[in-house]
Amino acid sequence: MACRTLPSRRQEEETTKDLALKLPPGKPGGHLPSIDETRPIGPGPASRRGSLPGLHPSFSRRNSLAGPLVGPGGRRPSLGPVPPLGSRVSFSGLPLMLPRRMAPSYRLEPAPGEHWEAAGAQRALEAALTTQLNGVCYCGSEAGKLVQALCEQIHTRVRELNLPRYKLVCNVVLGPREGQGVHVVSRALWDAVHDGLASATFTNPSLFAVATVHAVYWE
């Protein structure tokens, strides 16, 4: 039968004293050391959340731009000039007209006296074409500006017919008179009861013009 020698009281006291020396001072014997307490003091390997070695102290994740690319206050510079708030710019760089804003009327049809009249609109088209094109000779380089002026003049004259809740779409076909034949055709998806169109033509020895206005009721 094997026998085991029991440690003496003096050996037990020395063992307990050695364990107490290994624990940090001021902590009870049953306290486990935290991660901060066991971390070695002094420079060591960088942690996972720390910065990468070799980077400048001013470098951070939220401020990746450095040098002259950073504006005042650490803001990132924009890619280009920002247009004023509320303005619209086309792809060609020219400003666009702002859309008309009207309060809802909660009506499904025009009010009395505000219905579309094709006869009155046609007279307005004929007057605009005669005023703008009388005595004008066709010039290919100036045709675009002339058509734009015609559309603006037609839009202004038709608006004078008391049509507050109609959207107007103006189209003008302009070309030289060289003995050719031209057919201008238009198709639209609309309400046949309240919407409508008007068309007028103009010719002189140098040019011809066909103007069309589509009027769509805006509920």
From Swiss-Prot:
Bias-annotated ranges (Basic and acidic residues): 9-20
Keyword flag Phosphoprotein: yes
Main location: other
Record region (Disordered): 1-84
Modification Phosphoserine, positions: S64
Keyword field: Cell projection, Cilium, Cytoplasm, Cytoplasmic vesicle, Cytoskeleton, Flagellum, Nucleus, Phosphoprotein
Transmembrane regions: none
InterPro entries, A to Z: Tctex-1-like (IPR005334), Tctex-1-like_sf (IPR038586)
Compartment list: Cell projection, Cilium, Flagellum; Cytoplasmic vesicle, Secretory vesicle, Acrosome; Cytoplasm, Cytoskeleton, Cilium axoneme; Cytoplasm
GO MF annotation: an example: protein phosphatase 1 binding
CC annotations in GO: acrosomal vesicle; axoneme; cytoplasm; microtubule organizing center; nucleolus; nucleus; sperm flagellum
Subunit structure: Interacts with ENG/endoglin, TGFBR2 and TGFBR3. Interacts with PPP1CC.
Family assignment from sequence similarity: Belongs to the dynein light chain Tctex-type family.
Protein name: Dynein light chain Tctex-type 4
